Amino acid sequence: MTIIVTGAAGFIGSNLVKGLNDRGETNVIAVDNLTRADKFHNLVDCEISDYLDKQDFLARFARGEFGKVRAVFHEGACSDTMETDGRYMMENNYRYTLSLMESCLEQGTQFLYASSAATYGASQVFREDREFERPLNVYGYSKFLFDQIVRRRLPSALSQIVGFRYFNVYGPRETHKGRMASVAFHNFNQFRADGTVKLFGEYGGYAPGMQSRDFISVEDVVKVNLHFFDHPDKSGIFNLGTGRAQPFNDIAATVVNTLREAEGKPRLSLDELVQEGLLEYVKFPDALRGKYQCFTQSDVSKLRSAGYSEPFLSVEEGVARYCRWLIERAG
């Protein structure tokens, strides 16, 4: 039976296609917008049955041209939190997604989509409750608004609807994202280029490099998506993080030590990395004061209650794995 992945040439989408392939699923239709042509690299080692542009796909799917479709993994969206064109953002992230969900409901197709932790904005609590959702930008609002529609539709939905609020995802196939790529990716390239990693210094009551995020490997993101794919009776909106915040220091130290090990050098402690100038702290930029979250940590109790019990990779495990993947491809 056919499976469709939108945003298939993107970061999470291409990892999902690969994850489906690893389970023997090759009847996968990839949907994307290849205006940024370099994204095609993410699909070179994937098996797909067809490729469609996102604009052509929506109407064709609504007409039922693909026959019985088991599931749609909707990862396609504008994920640039700095985008200020609200009309474009709402059309692309909200209206398109709404139309796709309606078609899935009409056809009895599982609908698994990407929401975002940006729905929480400045909240200090990261739990899937309306009272904690305070998006700070139009990207977050586009995801927030669609989640509200989903909540209204869930009681009457006859097929699966699952939204995943991704936290800070890192891992293979994100190179095309540029400045929106993960901290791990940027730390890796910065150290290879300059021999040092720079992090923000003291700010918000946090010591240098101790501002923290809920960093999650794309490997775990794929596993959770496939878990719900295997359990079409489970619907809802779920946080998708590890449930454990880790400081930026952990990312930087793991990146540097993994690169050192690849060169046959010993691992160093955080203090030693700082003493040797391999990790530097810079003054917190004035432009970000009052606009920067120093701490995010997902509440994954709802995800666990829904039956997902697998452990999540720590930064030390996941980022090291990712760095080795990058090293292999850097030559």
From Swiss-Prot:
Cofactor note: Binds 1 NADP(+) per subunit.
CDD domains xrefs: ADP_GME_SDR_e
Binding-site residues, NADP(+): 11-12, 32-33, 39, 54, 75-79, 92, 143, 169, 177
Enzyme Commission (EC) number: 5.1.3.20
SUPFAM superfamilies with a match to the protein in the record: NAD(P)-binding Rossmann-fold domains (SSF51735)
Function: Catalyzes the interconversion between ADP-D-glycero-beta-D-manno-heptose and ADP-L-glycero-beta-D-manno-heptose via an epimerization at carbon 6 of the heptose.
Protein name: ADP-L-glycero-D-manno-heptose-6-epimerase
